[in-house]
Swiss-Prot record:
GO terms for biological process: arginine biosynthetic process via ornithine; L-arginine biosynthetic process. It is found in: Cytoplasm. It holds the Pfam family ASL_C2. This is Argininosuccinate lyase. Its main location: cytoplasm. The keyword Cytoplasm applies. Its EC number is 4.3.2.1. SUPFAM superfamilies: L-aspartase-like (SSF48557). Keywords: Amino-acid biosynthesis, Arginine biosynthesis, Cytoplasm, Lyase. The lineage of its organism: Bacteria, Pseudomonadati, Pseudomonadota, Gammaproteobacteria, Aeromonadales. It comes from Aeromonas salmonicida (strain A449). Belongs to the lyase 1 family. Argininosuccinate lyase subfamily.
Length: 461
């Protein structure tokens, strides 16, 4: 039976019921709905709606129901209930009779669903924080295992300057750290309970909403009933964090897809995260990474859809808000899956150290070192930049790397160049000079790795 049937003289059209019902997706809020109902029953005792004995019977029935839901959440989908709130109430009435009908006193589905969704977001957020840290740990472990590997750094997908594989991996650790921080901030902002705000104007019962909020694990209660039942900022904000983090993961995926190509050959992906072709037997496709890259659009699209659903909505609750769940559930599920898949990709990732070194030595990636050498000889940087550009053009013509040019060849472009230029053009020298904070000097990268290992160990502990 619908929770709102008394006002209507005829039943809903079956097509409308199918269109309107939300149980097929909001069943995922079952545990949170029961958790909120347990706390609400206690609050009703304090205002004299329920006796302690009645609350005890309801509590016992809800504990049994919670255990059943945890064991088999999909059982809920066998019901024709309108939504998860209707289903939980029907189960309680079946268990304790008319006593179950008293539980909704002073409560609306508007504040109820807002509470359920926030509780779900809190739990899912903690799970996602763990997945972010796990991926960071995977990146740090891979960086440590391949610390000696040098590879070319790119700008505009052109070889630019040598970096190390560890420095590359730590760049993504930094991105994920910002994702972690943003998620923590979002969880702090949603840590207020709307339960007790009723449909929109508050409840007529003197509920201690602060105590009620704390009982459910919130930091406190919301302050304005109109805002409380219509607020979906936390949904948009979590989707935004997911979208930005997925954008980071897409960059990670694209880098490794490129590094894994036959043309680059910098890394080899494990068979466990690749697939083959139904036609071409030689193929080993980076499907895990391509799916991460592709699913980014799905998550970003969900955020845009939610923003448009909320655009210009009048206060307070409107049925449009039912659109908050499917996109949110899918976005956070997808983000979680992609974080875990990215970590899996790293487990058996092989770095071709010789290939990466050869690539780092090619492409005139040491041209900046020659310019810095000229600056050290007293030539203004802009002039040095021009000299090196001309030198590179010549080196391309004679098909030599810079370090293989003879001294007379160098001196065609600047007489200040001496024999001491050659040590400056060596691969390790180019790394060693990057000593400012955040640079690729090996001692800096090692220190950054150690620091990351230490704070990740604290998280794991």
């Amino acid at each position: 039976m619908a929770l709102w049937g008394g006002r209507f003289s005829q039943g809903a059209d079956s097509r409308f019921k199918q269109f309107n019902d939300s149980l097929r997706f909001d069943y995922r809020l079952a545990e949170q709905d029961i958790q909120g109902s347990m706390a609400w029953a206690k609050a009703l005792v304090k205002v004299g709606v329920l006796t302690a004995d009645e609350q005890g019977k309801l509590q016992q029935a809800m504990e049994v129901l919670l255990a059943s839901v945890q064991q088999d959440p999909h059982q809920i989908l066998n019901s024709d209930a309108e939504d998860i709130h209707s289903w939980v109430e029907s189960q309680l009435i079946a268990a304790v009779g008319d006593l179950g009908k008293k539980l909704h006193t002073g409560r609306s589905r508007n504040d109820q669903v807002a509470t359920d969704l926030k509780l779900w977001c809190k739990a899912q957020g903690e799970l996602l924080l763990g997945s972010i840290s796990a991926l960071q740990a995977g990146l740090v472990a891979s960086a440590r295992a391949n610390q000696a590997a040098v590879l070319p750094g790119y700008t505009h997908l052109q070889r630019a300057q040598p970096v190390t594989f560890a420095h590359w991996a730590l760049a993504y650790v930094e991105m994920l750290e910002r994702d972690y921080s943003r998620l923590q901030d979002a969880l702090k902002r949603l840590d207020t309970s709307p339960l007790g705000c009723g449909a929109l104007a508050g409840t007529a019962y003197a509920i201690d909403r602060e105590a009620l909020a704390l009982d459910m694990g919130f930091g406190g209660a919301t302050r304005n009933s109109l805002d409380s039942v219509s607020d979906r900022d936390h949904v948009v904000e979590l989707m935004h964090v997911a979208s930005l983090s997925m954008t980071h993961l897409s960059r990670f995926a694209e880098d490794l897809i490129f590094y894994n190509t036959g043309e680059a050959g910098f890394v080899e992906l494990s068979d466990a995260v690749t697939s083959g072709s139904s036609l071409m037997p030689q193929k080993k496709n980076p499907d895990a990474l391509e799916l991460i890259r592709g699913k980014t659009g799905r998550v970003v699209g969900a955020q845009m859809g939610m923003l448009m659903s909320l655009k210009a909505l009048p206060l307070a609750y409107n049925k449009d808000m039912q659109e908050d769940k499917e996109g949110l559930f899918d976005a956070l599920d997808t983000w979680h899956d992609c974080l875990d898949m990215a970590a899996l990709v790293l487990i058996d990732l092989k770095v071709n150290v010789e290939r990466t070194k050869a690539a780092a030595q090619g492409g005139y990636a040491n041209a900046t070192e020659l310019a810095d050498y000229l600056v050290a000889k007293g030539i203004p940087f802009r002039e040095a930049h021009h000299i090196v550009g001309e030198t590179v053009v010549y080196a391309l013509e004679v098909k030599k790397p810079l370090e293989d040019l003879s001294l007379p060849e160098f001196q065609r472009f600047s007489p200040v160049i001496g024999e001491d230029v050659y040590p400056n053009l060596e691969l390790e020298a180019t790394l060693a000079k990057r000593v400012a904070k955040g640079g690729v000097a090996r001692e800096l990268v090692d220190a950054a790795l150690t620091a990351a290992e230490q704070w990740l160990a604290k998280w794991a502990g």
